[in-house]
């Protein structure tokens, strides 16, 4: 009886065997004709073969092999032979060491990244336990600022593929390609097209590193199960001529698709992933401004998605701005009275402006007058200077924040006024940098901030990576004194004043918010990520610090508390989803059960659904 059972095959197993025999016979004919040798028979497909050091060829798998072995989408699109692979490895290794000295302030950052990456390859549970237990030390290694250097040198660092690659050449194939990913359930996708990686510009297919790093933080901070995350690169080409002309570049060596051709690729990708994983949350990351806003508006009311550059950066900045209000000893409701000069009108800058306007307007009653009043608190300066209604060909996204020409004339300003001129005349409470221009807040600009009408002015140098920060904390504190508030997008060390006092360098990292937004959306079952859910996340972060901490100039908590911060933000997001009647349930918890949870119950619900890196007991079961 036992032998009979072993010999009995299911119809699906028989179909797979017959299919493989057909592929084998065709492979024999093909290989024998063209290369004069028989193929090696393998019993693995997809990621299994990529993770087998004996059979893995990496980028040398031909397109025929990729289709035959279910590898399509699991490798960068450019096919290379072994000689090209060796040349790429040696060339990029040397280039990598040369560029490392211009990278993060920690000269060992790249070496640490490599060691962590090797651990990730060997033992995922141990990797995340190390990351969680040392999050303050290693978050800057797996994410900003080190990840910027990783992306710049991705082809040299590429060893084992992570995530999926969808390219312009895969049009019409994506619906089947998603099934090459082995996970039956995916909770979180981070997707990029590589067009605007941090402040480094168009890095093409190398941008996959930012998606990998972001998802590491989803696992470490939010407890998303690492078997249910998927980093994705959508390769539509690159306008980076240096990359495009590099024979060792791993991506498509063509200019970026534009207009409807571009939209068609993204549409097909979204339809494919939501067909296979209907409940997945997709975070868009580092898309250039013109597409970041268009895609957000195109998908946000249909899919569970958000854009971290537009909405996440905005949320963290709002939390910091509200913290700056508290640091002045004022209630957060005074936020609409703050005068803010914003340097930068890209996706991040406009995202912050929109979020700040909505927050102010809500505090003022959400009337049309409230929106007008809120809008009047911002002065936006881009590469061409102050944006006013007199500007020609103004970006539609920046249009609502263009100042009235006559009003500016009364203030002694005009279209194109410099940042220094604007700061001198406006005397703002806050100078907010989202320009990606390192050193933009020059000595002259910071000197002008001395005229601020605020009792405790704030400097937010939020651009990443470190070299793109508008100024350093040392620059700001040395000119404005120890009473100011400082925040940045990249990590800096606190400034010692020599009198026992410390200038706190608050890092306004997006990792404070996006893990909680993602986790809260996931556990609520909300079909969309609403503005209210995003605002709830910001206000939760702003209220996290104690009064004593805020008065000391600490407006963001230490990264070491990230699991607790994320848990509270996720609970706040779920609570807002309940109030907006967006809750649809998660797994065994239906909507009615979630709606009954009080604040303590929500916290417990979130904590119980956060993955922890512990070794499970394994039991073998024969198929």
Swiss-Prot record:
Tissue expression: Expressed in leaves, stems, flowers, and roots (at protein level).
GO molecular function: ATP binding; cobalt ion binding; malate dehydrogenase (decarboxylating) (NAD+) activity; NAD binding; protein homodimerization activity; zinc ion binding
Assigned EC number: 1.1.1.39
Transit peptide: 1-38
Record CDD domains: NAD_bind_1_malic_enz (cd05312)
SUPFAM superfamilies named among the record's database cross-references: Aminoacid dehydrogenase-like, N-terminal domain (SSF53223), NAD(P)-binding Rossmann-fold domains (SSF51735)
Chain residues that bind a divalent metal cation: 285-286, 309
Cofactor, free-text remark: Divalent metal cations. Prefers magnesium or manganese.
Chief subcellular location: mitochondrion
Induction or repression: Accumulates during the night period (at protein level).
Keyword vocabulary terms for this entry: Metal-binding, Mitochondrion, NAD, Oxidoreductase, Transit peptide
Site feature Important for activity, where: 309
Field pH dependence: Optimum pH is 6.4 for homodimer and 6.5 for NAD-MEH heterodimer. In the presence of coenzyme A (CoA), optimum pH is 6.8 for NAD-MEH heterodimer.
Binding site for NAD(+): 196, 309, 464
Record-annotated active site: 143 (proton donor), 214 (proton acceptor)
Subcellular location: Mitochondrion
Catalytically driven reaction(s): (S)-malate + NAD(+) = pyruvate + CO2 + NADH
Quaternary context: Homodimer. Heterodimer of two related subunits in NAD-MEH complex. Interacts with NAD-ME2.
Role of this protein: Involved in the regulation of sugars and amino acids metabolisms during the night period.
Protein's name according to its UniProt entry: NAD-dependent malic enzyme 1, mitochondrial
Source organism per UniProt: Arabidopsis thaliana (Mouse-ear cress)
Gene that this sequence comes from: NAD-ME1
């Amino acid at each position: 009886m036992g032998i009979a059972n072993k010999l009995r095959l299911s119809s699906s197993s028989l179909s797979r065997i017959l299919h493989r025999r057909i592929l084998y016979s065709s492979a024999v004919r093909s290989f024998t004709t063209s290369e004069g040798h028989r193929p090696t028979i393998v019993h693995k497909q997809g990621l299994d073969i990529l993770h087998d050091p004996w059979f893995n060829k990496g980028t040398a798998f031909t397109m025929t092999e990729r289709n035959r072995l279910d590898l399509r989408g699991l490798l960068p699109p450019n096919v290379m032979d072994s000689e090209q692979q060796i040349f790429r490895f040696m060339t990029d290794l040397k280039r990598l060491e040369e560029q490392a000295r211009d990278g993060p302030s920690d000269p060992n950052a790249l070496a640490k990244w490599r060691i962590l990456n090797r651990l990730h390859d060997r033992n995922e549970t141990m990797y995340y336990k190390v990351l969680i237990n040392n999050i303050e030390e290693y978050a800057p290694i797996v994410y900003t600022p080190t990840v910027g250097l990783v992306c710049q040198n991705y082809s040299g660092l590429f060893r084992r593929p992570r995530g999926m690659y969808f390219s312009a050449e895969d049009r019409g194939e994506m619906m089947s390609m998603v099934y090459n990913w082995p996970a039956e359930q995916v909770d979180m996708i981070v997707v990029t097209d590589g067009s605007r990686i941090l402040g480094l510009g168009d890095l093409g297919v190398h941008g996959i590193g930012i998606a990998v790093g972001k998802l590491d933080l989803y696992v470490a901070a939010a407890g998303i199960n690492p078997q249910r995350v998927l980093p994705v690169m959508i390769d539509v080409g690159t306008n980076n001529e240096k990359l495009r002309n590099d024979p060792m570049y791993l991506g498509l060596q063509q200019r970026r698709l534009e207009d409807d051709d571009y939209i068609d690729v993204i549409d097909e990708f979204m339809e494919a992933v939501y067909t296979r994983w209907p409940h997945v949350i997709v975070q868009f990351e580092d898309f250039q401004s013109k597409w970041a806003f268009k895609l957000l508006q195109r998908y946000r009311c249909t899919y569970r998605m958000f854009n971290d550059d537009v909405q996440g950066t905005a949320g963290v900045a709002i939390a910091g701005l509200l913290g700056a209000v508290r640091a002045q000893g004022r209630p957060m409701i005074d936020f609409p009275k703050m005068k803010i000069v914003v340097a930068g009108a890209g996706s991040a800058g406009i995202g912050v402006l929109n979020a700040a306007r909505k927050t102010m307007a809500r505090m003022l009653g959400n009337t049309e007058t409230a929106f007008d009043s809120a809008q009047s608190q911002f002065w936006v300066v881009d590469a061409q200077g102050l944006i006013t209604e007199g500007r020609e060909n103004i970006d539609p996204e920046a249009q609502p924040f263009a100042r009235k020409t006559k009003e500016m004339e009364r203030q002694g300003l005009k279209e194109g006024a410099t940042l220094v001129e604007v700061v001198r005349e406006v005397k703002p409470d806050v100078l907010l940098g989202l320009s990606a221009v390192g050193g933009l807040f020059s000595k002259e600009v910071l000197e002008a901030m001395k005229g601020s009408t605020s009792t405790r002015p704030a400097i937010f140098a939020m651009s990443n990576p470190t070299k793109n920060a508008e100024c350093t904390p040392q620059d700001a504190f040395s000119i404005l004194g120890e009473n100011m508030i400082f925040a940045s997008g990249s990590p800096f060390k606190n400034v010692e004043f020599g009198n026992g006092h410390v200038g706190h360098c608050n890092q306004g990292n997006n990792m404070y918010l996006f893990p909680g937004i993602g986790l809260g959306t996931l556990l609520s079952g909300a079909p969309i990520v609403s503005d209210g859910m995003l605002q709830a996340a910001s206000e939760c972060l702003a209220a996290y610090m104690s009064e004593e901490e805020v008065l000391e100039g600490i407006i963001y908590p230490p990264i070491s508390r990230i699991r607790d911060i994320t848990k509270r933000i996720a609970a706040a997001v779920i609570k807002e989803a309940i109030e907006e009647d967006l809750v649809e349930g998660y797994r065994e918890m239906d909507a009615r059960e979630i709606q009954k949870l009080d604040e303590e119950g929500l916290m417990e619900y979130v904590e119980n659904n956060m993955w922890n890196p512990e070794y499970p007991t394994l039991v073998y079961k024969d198929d």
